[in-house]
Amino acid sequence: MTQLISVNSRSYRLSSAPTIVICVDGCEQEYINQAIQAGQAPFLAELTGFGTVLTGDCVVPSFTNPNNLSIVTGAPPSVHGICGNFFFDQETQEEVLMNDAKYLRAPTILAEMAKAGQLVAVVTAKDKLRNLLGHQLKGICFSAEKADQVNLEEHGVENILARVGMPVPSVYSADLSEFVFAAGLSLLTNERPDFMYLSTTDYVQHKHAPGTPEANAFYAMMDSYFKRYHEQGAIVAITADHGMNAKTDAIGRPNILFLQDLLDAQYGAQRTRVLLPITDPYVVHHGALGSYATVYLRDAVPQRDAIDFLAGIAGVEAVLTRSQACQRFELPEDRIGDLVVLGERLTVLGSAADKHDLSGLTVPLRSHGGVSEQKVPLIFNRKLVGLDSPGRLRNFDIIDLALNHLA
């Protein structure tokens, strides 16, 4: 078996102990702090003693797909090409989901590990990530969302519902993430993969603020699984795809800037196109509203004038040109618009008001996408070695840290 592999200009040592990398979707660090203070996360609380607790930056836009793919490639979107959940395909002139592996431009560490002879397992909450994370992977790969369809030929394992002892959970529930952890425990106990990647859903974080009973119960559930993985001798590495913030005014009303309506009023209809890369099939909990948008200019709308107009709107944190955004956030130039707009911490960006169904927002809006959701945890159940001055850490450094720098 190969002991060292090279993927996207980085080298990884193959682990001799089961290694579990966990992406906790929407894990604003305050959730962990509050759960620990409430006595709901004793294992995480103990990690300051025998493990490592750090902070890193996620990829901007701070959305699910770009960050999960950055984690499993060890590289930013400029390398792997996935810069949102949704993008405007210039060739077809259509807005499309980036769930298809044909949009992926780089190999994953997961697939390369499997090629090197390791048993690799991937369990995701939502099926939207399965094709991307499992691209060219010869191993185990399935989603909790479609656990009833898991079979040996396609997914590398079978009878997962019976093994886990849970029914197929609702996609809008905490149970969807718990199924991921329970499935991971079953795989660790039975197949004992060399490397496992677990990715959850941020349904709870969209609905419940840090320190609420629902949030603390969710983190207590995760904490119990982290402890069991640890007790079975696994290396456990935990990070997030993005943080989460309230996007409301002082009395809980959504703070929304409908950019398409504002641009249409300024320049006329059909002269600009606002695209929201947070858009995906699961919009009940966020209404396709996030703090990052990209804008395409048409019919000779002056770029400088559009920048000044957008930057002058209260709630807009920054407006960047395509080249500025690509340089700052390491994005692929052919998959973003002429401008990138970032909302302030308490503000989300929409397109046109009549394009968003907010009926599912039964609690004050919480969302992500901007730089205010960039800080994420980097947590390990072992001490880091050989990294005296690590400098800026990213969530997509986690596999390198887990395989190359843990005692």
From Swiss-Prot:
> Which residues does the annotation say bind substrate?
T64, D202, H242, H368
Q: Which GO terms describe its biological process?
A: phosphonoacetate metabolic process
- Name the domain of life: Bacteria
Influence of pH: Optimum pH is approximately 7.8.
Q: Which reaction does it catalyse?
A: phosphonoacetate + H2O = acetate + phosphate + H(+)
The annotation note on the cofactor reads: Binds 2 Zn(2+) ions per subunit.
The name this protein carries in UniProt is Phosphonoacetate hydrolase
Needs which cofactor? Zn(2+)
Q: What is the lineage of its organism?
A: Bacteria, Pseudomonadati, Pseudomonadota, Gammaproteobacteria, Pseudomonadales
| Species for this entry | Pseudomonas fluorescens
Tell me, what does this protein do in biology?
Answer: Specifically hydrolyzes phosphonoacetate. Does not have activity on other organophosphonates or acetates.
Note one Pfam family from the annotation: Phosphodiest
Give the protein family. Answer: Belongs to the alkaline phosphatase family. PhnA subfamily.
User: Quaternary structure per UniProt?
Assistant: Homodimer.
